[in-house]
Structure formats: structure tokens, C-alpha cells
A protein has these predicted regions:
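Long, hydrophobic, amphipathic alpha-helical segments used as structural scaffolds
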Residues: 32, 59, 79-86, 115, ...
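Membrane-interface alpha-helices
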Residues: 61-92
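Polybasic, low-complexity association/targeting segments
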Residues: 1-19
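Membrane-inserting effector segments that mediate pore formation, membrane fusion
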Residues: 42-71
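Intrinsically disordered, low-complexity, charge-dense segments enriched in Lys/Arg
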Residues: 97-187
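A structural signal for well-ordered alpha-helices, especially hydrophobic packing surfaces
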Residues: 25-28, 49-52, 75, 79-82
Length: 187
């Protein structure tokens, strides 16, 4: 049951992943969101754009499944730290925010203790640095903010646009993510 629910919830999340990244970019730019959450969101975007993924050894849609899960962890923390701003963003992007609790429950139900691997990756988001641009600078410095905006939109054009059929096909093989995550838990 937990696998089916996980796939059911993550299918639309991956189909709209590009839209979700734009929503995360709006969080980075929103001064009503606490700085810690904004920096974590900027780090999440840096991770999505420039890393090889949070789940070792997977490619394509499944690689970005890890990224989608990481974004959910960032949103969960934001909900705790900036509930008013979270609610405001939820009104603008309900398709991303409304299923968050269910997605987190499904993630924990399916991945179990493997979630810790993703949590450890997310903890490093505030310290990420790419091409001389740090996550913290992306909320403080207009040049860094513009660079992040451009980098996100370039990634959306070049690599992050998933066809619904591709998502459905690849999520049928979602169990491929379990072993790589389990190997990281054991470390």
C-alpha cells in the first residue's frame, strides 16, 4: 500500500516539477518568508540544477524524484518557521502545497529510515555554493538573485520538462531508489 500511495502522489509532483521549481524561486524572493527557509530554498534550487542527484545511481525522472522529495522537506520546514508565508504561497500554488502532508506521510511510509539520507542532503542546502554563488547570497544580493533566477529558467528549458508518459513509465520502477538509499543509511 505505501508504495502505491507514494507513486500516486509523486506522479503529479514530477509532472509539474518545473512549475514547482518556479514556486520555490518565488519563496527565495519573498521577504515575508524567514531567511533560514529562503536560504534552504535557494540551496534546494542549486542542488536541483547542479548536482547529480540525492539518490546515487539513478537517472532521468527518478533522479529528479529525489529532488522533488528534497523540496518537500524544505517546504515542511518552511511551514513550521513561516506559517503565514507558507499559507500565502499555498494560495498561489495550491497544487504544490496542499498535498504536502500526504506526500510527506507517503515518503516516510515508503522509504522508512531511508528518509534520513534525504534529510542529510537537505541539511547542507544553506551552505551550497555554485560558480561562486552561495545560497545565502541568493536572498541578499541582487546579482546572485538574478543569477539564480536565470539558472533555474535555463534548467527548465534545457532539462526539466517531463512528459506524463515518461513519469508514469519510470515510476513503475521506483523500487530502484531503495537500494542506493539503504546503502547510504548503512554508512
Amino acid at each position: 500500500m505505501s508504495r502505491e500511495r507514494f507513486v500516486e502522489l509523486m506522479t503529479p509532483a514530477l509532472i509539474r516539477f518545473g512549475q514547482d521549481l518556479k514556486s520555490v524561486l518565488r519563496i527565495v524572493e519573498d521577504p515575508e518568508v524567514d531567511d533560514e527557509s529562503r536560504i534552504a530554498a535557494a540551496g534546494a534550487l542549486l542542488h536541483v540544477i547542479f548536482s547529480s542527484g540525492a539518490i546515487p545511481g539513478v537517472r532521468g525522472v527518478l533522479r529528479h524524484l529525489g529532488d522533488a522529495l528534497l523540496i518537500r522537506l524544505v517546504l515542511s520546514d518552511m511551514r513550521k518557521r513561516s506559517p503565514g508565508a507558507f499559507d500565502k504561497h499555498a494560495q498561489v500554488s495550491p497544487e504544490m502545497f496542499e498535498p504536502l502532508s500526504d506526500e510527506l506521510d507517503a515518503m516516510h511510509g515508503y522509504l522508512g529510515d531511508r528518509v534520513i539520507v534525504l534529510e542529510q542532503v537537505a541539511e547542507k542546502f544553506p551552505t551550497l555554493n555554485q560558480q561562486g554563488y552561495e545560497a545565502a547570497h541568493c536572498i541578499e544580493d541582487p546579482e546572485s538573485s538574478t543569477w539564480l533566477y536565470d539558472a533555474v529558467h535555463e534548467a527548465l528549458i534545457d532539462e526539466i520538462d517531463f512528459d506524463e508518459e515518461d513519469v508514469i513509465r519510470e515510476l513503475k520502477q521506483v523500487d530502484q531508489i531503495l537500494a542506493p538509499l539503504a546503502s547510504r543509511v548503512a554508512r
